[in-house]
Amino acid sequence: MRKYKLLFLLIIGVLNASGSSPYISPGIQLGFNTKGNLFLSVQTTFGYVSNSGPQPFGLTLGLRWYKMEEKWERYSYNDLQIWPFIGGVGIGQMRDKDGNKYLRFKTGVGALFYATYDYCKDLEIAKHNFGGIGTLPIYNILGGDYNPL
């Protein structure tokens, strides 16, 4: 366990160099799918951003609820994503309450609030999803000197 802690600290030290930072970004999304179902998502992205290094990337973990007739159906999801400019892409999976997994592709454009589209392969109730999400990125967690302004 000690080796992993030391490796983690070394990685954080390297990532914090030269105007870079790990970050966390909670978000809330509201949208609809092509079948007319409303959905609500909450998510948190854990990522890395740099002025001079690789493009911003992150791991997103979230929950989504689809309004179905008189009930809400819950799904969980995770994505790996890269947001090089004011837009980006991601790939991941959604899971239903029974543990079934669905491949998921996502894209979006904007900053702090952005428009989104995601496609879930084989998910009959919601293959095409459109929405808007508001996020609150918190930079320089665990140190770092990234300044987005």
Can you name each region flagged by the protein language model?
Residues 43-47, 77-81, 106-108, 131-135:
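Outer-membrane beta-barrel architecture
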Residues 73-77, 99-104, 127:
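Short, surface-exposed coil-to-beta transition loops
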Residues 94-110:
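Acidic, glycine-rich flexible loop segments
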Residues 42, 127-149:
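Outer-membrane beta-barrel "beta-signal"
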Residues 1-21, 146-149:
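Cleavable N-terminal export/targeting peptides
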Residues 84-87, 111-114, 137-142:
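Glycine- and small hydrophobic-rich membrane-insertion segments that are intrinsically disordered
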Residues 22-34, 42-69, 76-78, 86-97, ...:
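Transmembrane beta-strand segments that form the barrel wall of outer-membrane beta-barrel proteins
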